[in-house]
Amino acid sequence: MSKIVGSDRVKRGMAEMQKGGVIMDVVNAEQAKIAEEAGAVAVMALERVPSDIRAAGGVARMANPKIVEEVMNAVSIPVMAKARIGHITEARVLESMGVDYIDESEVLTPADEEYHLRKDQFTVPFVCGCRNLGEAARRIGEGAAMLRTKGEPGTGNIVEAVRHMRRVNSEVSRLTVMNDDEIMTFAKDLGAPYEVLKQIKDNGRLPVVNFAAGGVATPQDAALMMELGADGVFVGSGIFKSEDPEKFAKAIVQATTHYQDYELIGKLASELGTAMKGLDINQISLEERMQERGW
C-alpha cells in the first residue's frame, strides 16, 4: 500500500496560518514556554541555537528526539524541527514523532551535497531557505510549503537576510513581465522548474509564504524585514542570546505585528537591554558561511 502524503494545498495552507508571526528557536521546554507566552506563532526545537552551532564547529545534526518531545509536550503552538539537507532518515524520524513542520536546514551540516529532500514524498510540510528565485523555485518544485531567507544564521547581522529578500522580490518582479519563451530561458538560466516559474508569473508572487531568517537580533530588524515584504520572521540566536530574552521575545513579536508603527518600535527598543553581539559578515570566510550550503 502506498504511503499517503499531504497535498501541496493543505501543506501551504498550514504555513499560511503562520503569516505575520514570529517563529522562535528554542532548546528546551522553558524557552518554548517563554516563546509561547511572548506570542510566537511556532517554535523551532533544536539542541543549540545557530550562534552556538557556529562557535562549536564540527558536525551539527538533528536534535536529540528527547529535546523535540520535551518542547512538543510543553506548548500548544506548532513545533518545528531541523533536519540536515538531504538526510531522509532524520526527516522520517521527525515526521514519525509528529512535528508540525520540518526545516531542511543549512544551519546543520548537510548530509547530501547533491540532492535536497523530495519533500513532496512526506506528509509533514517543510520549510527551506533560499537566497534567490532559483533556490526558491527549486525548493518549491521539491515540495516545500514555506520558504525563508537564509541570511547568515547566528551572526545577529541582518545584512544577508535583507540581500536575500530583496533579490527574491526583484527576480519575481522581473519574471512577471516575461513571455513564455523568456520564462523558458530564465528557467534554464536559474536551473529551476519551468512550471513553478510560470505559476509565479501568473500569480505575481511566490505560491508559498516567504519568511525572514538569519540575523534578526532586534525589534527594528524584524520590522525592517516585514517592511521589505517578508510574510513573517524567524528568530534564532537573537532572543536567547540577548540580555533579557522575555522582553526581547515580546518586543520582536510586537514589532513584527506593528512594523510601521515607528513610535511603538522606538519605545520597545528603549526598554530593552543589550542585544546579542553581532558578527561582521566580511570576517566570515565563504567556506564558513552557512548560507552557502545547499544549491
From Swiss-Prot:
Pathway: Cofactor biosynthesis; pyridoxal 5'-phosphate biosynthesis
Function as written in the Swiss-Prot or TrEMBL entry: Catalyzes the formation of pyridoxal 5'-phosphate from ribose 5-phosphate (RBP), glyceraldehyde 3-phosphate (G3P) and ammonia. The ammonia is provided by the PdxT subunit. Can also use ribulose 5-phosphate and dihydroxyacetone phosphate as substrates, resulting from enzyme-catalyzed isomerization of RBP and G3P, respectively.
Protein name: Pyridoxal 5'-phosphate synthase subunit PdxS
Binding site for D-ribose 5-phosphate: 25, 154, 215, 236-237
HAMAP family for the chain: PdxS
Reactions performed catalytically: aldehydo-D-ribose 5-phosphate + D-glyceraldehyde 3-phosphate + L-glutamine = pyridoxal 5'-phosphate + L-glutamate + phosphate + 3 H2O + H(+)
Record keywords, A-Z: Lyase, Pyridoxal phosphate, Schiff base
Catalytic residues, chain numbering: 82
EC number: 4.3.3.6
A Pfam entry, by short name: SOR_SNZ
The protein's assembly and partners: In the presence of PdxT, forms a dodecamer of heterodimers.
Residues engaged in binding D-glyceraldehyde 3-phosphate: 166
Species annotation: Staphylococcus epidermidis (strain ATCC 35984 / DSM 28319 / BCRC 17069 / CCUG 31568 / BM 3577 / RP62A)
Family statement drawn from the similarity comment of this UniProt entry: Belongs to the PdxS/SNZ family.
